[in-house]
Amino acid sequence: MEPSALRKAGSEQEEGFEGLPRRVTDLGMVSNLRRSNSSLFKSWRLQCPFGNNDKQESLSSWIPENIKKKECVYFVESSKLSDAGKVVCQCGYTHEQHLEEATKPHTFQGTQWDPKKHVQEMPTDAFGDIVFTGLSQKVKKYVRVSQDTPSSVIYHLMTQHWGLDVPNLLISVTGGAKNFNMKPRLKSIFRRGLVKVAQTTGAWIITGGSHTGVMKQVGEAVRDFSLSSSYKEGELITIGVATWGTVHRREGLIHPTGSFPAEYILDEDGQGNLTCLDSNHSHFILVDDGTHGQYGVEIPLRTRLEKFISEQTKERGGVAIKIPIVCVVLEGGPGTLHTIDNATTNGTPCVVVEGSGRVADVIAQVANLPVSDITISLIQQKLSVFFQEMFETFTESRIVEWTKKIQDIVRRRQLLTVFREGKDGQQDVDVAILQALLKASRSQDHFGHENWDHQLKLAVAWNRVDIARSEIFMDEWQWKPSDLHPTMTAALISNKPEFVKLFLENGVQLKEFVTWDTLLYLYENLDPSCLFHSKLQKVLVEDPERPACAPAAPRLQMHHVAQVLRELLGDFTQPLYPRPRHNDRLRLLLPVPHVKLNVQGVSLRSLYKRSSGHVTFTMDPIRDLLIWAIVQNRRELAGIIWAQSQDCIAAALACSKILKELSKEEEDTDSSEEMLALAEEYEHRAIGVFTECYRKDEERAQKLLTRVSEAWGKTTCLQLALEAKDMKFVSHGGIQAFLTKVWWGQLSVDNGLWRVTLCMLAFPLLLTGLISFREKRLQDVGTPAARARAFFTAPVVVFHLNILSYFAFLCLFAYVLMVDFQPVPSWCECAIYLWLFSLVCEEMRQLFYDPDECGLMKKAALYFSDFWNKLDVGAILLFVAGLTCRLIPATLYPGRVILSLDFILFCLRLMHIFTISKTLGPKIIIVKRMMKDVFFFLFLLAVWVVSFGVAKQAILIHNERRVDWLFRGAVYHSYLTIFGQIPGYIDGVNFNPEHCSPNGTDPYKPKCPESDATQQRPAFPEWLTVLLLCLYLLFTNILLLNLLIAMFNYTFQQVQEHTDQIWKFQRHDLIEEYHGRPAAPPPFILLSHLQLFIKRVVLKTPAKRHKQLKNKLEKNEEAALLSWEIYLKENYLQNRQFQQKQRPEQKIEDISNKVDAMVDLLDLDPLKRSGSMEQRLASLEEQVAQTAQALHWIVRTLRASGFSSEADVPTLASQKAAEEPDAEPGGRKKTEEPGDSYHVNARHLLYPNCPVTRFPVPNEKVPWETEFLIYDPPFYTAERKDAAAMDPMGDTLEPLSTIQYNVVDGLRDRRSFHGPYTVQAGLPLNPMGRTGLRGRGSLSCFGPNHTLYPMVTRWRRNEDGAICRKSIKKMLEVLVVKLPLSEHWALPGGSREPGEMLPRKLKRILRQEHWPSFENLLKCGMEVYKGYMDDPRNTDNAWIETVAVSVHFQDQNDVELNRLNSNLHACDSGASIRWQVVDRRIPLYANHKTLLQKAAAEFGAHY
């Protein structure tokens, strides 16, 4: 039976269940769980001081009215003195600390001090704010409360008046109250894990609140977090529940109207036996029972408060789930053991930290043992090890009690998690807490997915995909894809690629997941550190459509994203997201603070709830998600999404383009390198998929290159690759083959160039079959005109015709410049003008040719981005300038000079045609890059040239005022010196006054150097000029020139390594240019231009790109092509995965993982390792137990009948009375604990619905045959309303002497299903063994109390009437009832009135006129179980035995079934009746579920 349900089953008539948990509203839930209210209140105080005073006044009036304290009202002198030697009352306080009336003579004079009589409640006088003097100046909250204060009042105080958010998780930390030593590493792990889970989930941490032991450890963990965290991360909520009477210096906290704030001094040296409050806790609840110095007063109130909070429900996206709670245990003593036992009994999962000492280590040592192996001697041994100092104080009864409690704790394995440092993959406490919550969640009964959903969010928050895969995504719970959408969004934003992969494996379809609202939400939560976020902000601020009255922070729309993406992809693409028609949709503001998405997903749930009514999907959701991941440079996430993409080659190339553009603007070098590496990876992916396609079908693969992709801005794969400069992709053999085919047009690529040249020179040869065509119609039956058109429109022919034309133009141009340049232009010169005009028309055609409709400005920018176009425009403008000067007689010669210079530019233009050559093409690139090298080299060279030239000029020449000669001397001569032209006069040897002008008056001679006129010798220091010359030549000729050569060599090597790629890449531009160029060469091209002018300007025919380079396919053809591409993409991914597995590094990693798995398997405890073998042994043991019991019954019967003497009785093994003789109705699963075959529920220490505590009975002491000398159970018999139908009360045996056992006593049947039972001292003994309690308890009679449980079942059917199935098996429905104040559903059975056949509960839901017919159904029903029922109300002298009868209706139209349905009704208001699907996770009492499991097994149905 589930622990939380055990104590609820103990009502007088099985119907008294506890009430439903109350439901609280979600108080101001925000998406960020980490935002603390203390910080909110702090800012609120700063802004609203008057409101703060009102709040204090409200608190001062509310708390005294609703919260009380306790005061001793009568002084009874104690035999003990205080630490100061003063006389104290038995409450622990002195005379001075009592009220004045308490020390006066009173009516209680002479009586013994009783807290129930001598302690009274009064309005509390200690509450408000607290500040720890000398330490942190943060304001804390505190309140003094009575130990009897309702939990609802305290919870109201915390959530409403203290302003705490409703927690998403409750962490109760318990353990050693005194300081203890922990290993530094374990201490660090504990602190880090505790803070991580609290910060991530928005949890409340509840401790004892004192500055010692585990509470101090928690406080220091919170302190370290506060010191290292930012303001936005908020404050952890740490609540200390301490005993008021043990708080040192508590007098300073008392003030009738509250203290705002109270100053508290942390005085550890003077605290004595008391304790100080911990300064690192945020809130304190000080529990008062009117005593002083008594520890443990807060435990009951803390337990009730934690249970109350955990029973509250919190709205999560329209679904109410309970607040999960977990107990974390460090070290500890008897109190800690009691706390763990209570926690597990109430269904609270516990995490025990092994290595922390004492109780925690004792439990950790035995946690993996079967309960039957946890014996008194074993616990005694463990206590002697871990409690060495106080072991001698342990009495036998105390050891027995500890053994019983530890057995109960270990028995609830689903609620116990042991954290072992560095084992089982647990590297932090937060993982152990997550596992504990998951284990507890799996053991709970519930209908919906809300519990699983919450655990999944925790797993995502802590990034434990392994736990989610093994503990959450299992066959026992089927996830709907829509249920995973909020968590999927959380995983995406928090960059958890493994979780995204897991969700995709479990049915999430990206096409259904990505809606406009989801996509917008994702972009609103971009990582602020990524470059795309800043670019998006810039676009938002500069949005021209933003209204003038708009707020400071503009609203994000998807067209803003499209604008940034178009900047990255290029203007040749269309916007990916259109502008909305209406801009009034409510959106979040941006910039959005980067919130680490919290696990509760409230905003996500509300997002999906809001969009569920009008879901609008994007055109390509996978593309949208891929872009979102790529712009944030998330490698693994993008890879997972790309694997799901449809248009995968275009997607990979687009990703490469985006990443390369982002890397150019990224300032962080590491990020830029990562982007370039990722861009290269996606280029390789595109190559890999295209290779697979090309191998399969060349024609279809080439269609993929030119297919217009609507999803990527109506562009093609080839365009994306060219714009991204993906040279490796463009140089792929398949793409080059396609370009070659385009280059040759309709000609066959097998034609040699010599054939083409011959046909160009003598085109009649076309009719001879010298040229072959690709199409058979041209090759075989083509007309001469068609063959000529196909030949002369081929780009290769157009190219060579243009080359011939251009060479003719240059020759004619050179002839005119050198031979025939007349004042009046000759016909040759006029031909040049016409020729140039045709070139101008062609450049204008290229400029205005806009098939992609980019617009004139963008097309012009794209045109001038090409170097050769710039050179063309420069040459044309220079020609126009020269022509203008040439036509003016006065400037004829300058015109000729300009035209001569222009001839150089036209000759340089020849290099463009060399790009088609594999040899010369890369050399042009080398020249371009070397020119850049020279440009930067000149800066270094200019430093030496100018410095030497100026120094030389100043030393040699005095006051040279002629600018031309000054430039010659300072710069020109110094530059010529580099090439060996050394001035002769620099050393004075070749000085000749006749070669210079002494005064500088001769314009054709330089000025003479400084010289001695008398001796005709130079006067300047010759040694200095020679030394300068030597140094100058050393640095320029040797150092700088060799540096330039090295730079050229590096550039050459760089280009030479990629010669093939560069040539293949740049030949595309030439091919595309001549593919779209008119066939006729200049100047005949003017005819084609005239035709184009008529079509475009006169007829308004739009320009269209040739289908050979950009082809828009039909929908059906495109869908088939993309499906084919997807299929081959999967092949590529499989091959890639296989290749990765074949790598040595991967093989080593796989071997390492297998070894680790094997080690883990060997380290598992025997229970887990044996698996199914243990289940078989348990089943065998059950059968043996049943056989032994039958033998015992036979022996007893024969002996009672006198068939044998006492001496002849065979000696049998002692009957383990609770060996599960078909006793699964006792609330345990068949294989729960192999060897733990005693009744369990009947030995729980706390008896249901009363304060009675049983005597602890460990497993080994259950059989009556086992000696148990200290066994002294209490006697308890409860009062019942039906006194006439029950046995006499009291602990005296006289009234019980009239009861006759083992027979039918009047109307009451006192016979046991297990045969005659022993009667000792007038009381019957439970045949299953000791329970720890004597008397009748809350049952109606001594001995067996017979009950009946009818299981009314039918087949579950769908709308068509067919029987539903699950895992092949048919599904049953059972009739269940839920009465007022009960939490669980139950079978309509239980106890019966003496002489009656129908249970009382069944009569309450069945009309009286139908009772006889139902009795007949019971008589005809199938008896499923008959025997002892392990119930928490059982005692040594009274127990429950039950009969379970199955009443099954095979046909849905059964007359009796219809009659039963019509006669069902609820006599009690609030009672519910329904048909419940039979499943092992339904919320039904565990005893009843076991009975139901037997019935399902009988029918072979699903359970």
Curated annotation (Swiss-Prot):
Activity regulation behaviour: Activated by intracellular ADP-ribose, beta-NAD (NAD(+)) and similar compounds, and by oxidative stress caused by reactive oxygen or nitrogen species. Ca(2+) and PI(4,5)P2 are required for channel opening by ADP-ribose. Activation by ADP-ribose and beta-NAD is strongly increased by moderate heat (35 to 40 degrees Celsius). Likewise, reactive oxygen species lower the threshold for activation by moderate heat (37 degrees Celsius). Activated by moderate heat (35 to 40 degrees Celsius).
Outcome after substituting R1407G: No effect on channel activity
Chain positions covered by the region annotation Disordered: 1-20, 1206-1237
GO cellular component terms, semicolon-separated: cell projection; cytoplasmic vesicle membrane; ficolin-1-rich granule membrane; lysosomal membrane; lysosome; perikaryon; plasma membrane; specific granule membrane
Extracellular side: 817-827, 889-896, 951-970, 986-1022
Post-translational modification, as annotated: Phosphorylation of TRPM2 at Thr-740 by protein kinase C (PKC) counteracts the effect of cytosolic Ca(2+) and elevates the temperature threshold.
Disulfide-bonded cysteines: C996-C1008
Keywords: Calcium, Calcium channel, Calcium transport, Cell membrane, Cell projection, Cytoplasmic vesicle, Disulfide bond, Ion channel, Ion transport, Lysosome, Membrane, Metal-binding, Phosphoprotein, Sodium, Sodium channel, Sodium transport, Transmembrane, Transmembrane helix, Transport
Protein localization: Cell membrane; Perikaryon; Cell projection; Cytoplasmic vesicle
GO molecular function: calcium channel activity; calcium ion binding; intracellularly gated calcium channel activity; ligand-gated calcium channel activity; manganese ion transmembrane transporter activity; mono-ADP-D-ribose binding; monoatomic cation channel activity; sodium channel activity
Stated consequence of mutating K1005A: Decreases channel activity
Record InterPro entries: Ion_trans_dom (IPR005821), NUDIX_hydrolase-like_dom_sf (IPR015797), NUDIX_hydrolase_dom (IPR000086), TRPM (IPR050927), TRPM_SLOG (IPR041491)
Motif Selectivity filter boundaries: 979-982
One BP term from GO: cellular response to calcium ion
Result of altering G980 to A/C/S: Decreases permeability of Ca(2+) over Na(+)
Stretches assigned to the Cytoplasmic side: 1-752, 770-795, 849-867, 918-929, 1045-1079, 1099-1503
Residue list for modification Phosphothreonine: T740
Free-text note regarding domains: Contains two binding sites for ADP-ribose, one in the N-terminal part of the channel and the other in the C-terminal nudix hydrolase domain. Both sites seem to have a role in channel opening, but the interaction of ADP-ribose with the N-terminal site is absolutely required for channel activation.
Subunit structure: Homotetramer. Isoform 1 can interact with isoform 3. This interaction decreases Ca(2+) influx through isoform 1 and suppresses susceptibility to oxidative stress-induced cell death.
Name by which UniProt lists this protein: Transient receptor potential cation channel subfamily M member 2
Source species: Homo sapiens (Human)
Upper taxonomic lineage: Eukaryota, Metazoa, Chordata, Craniata, Vertebrata
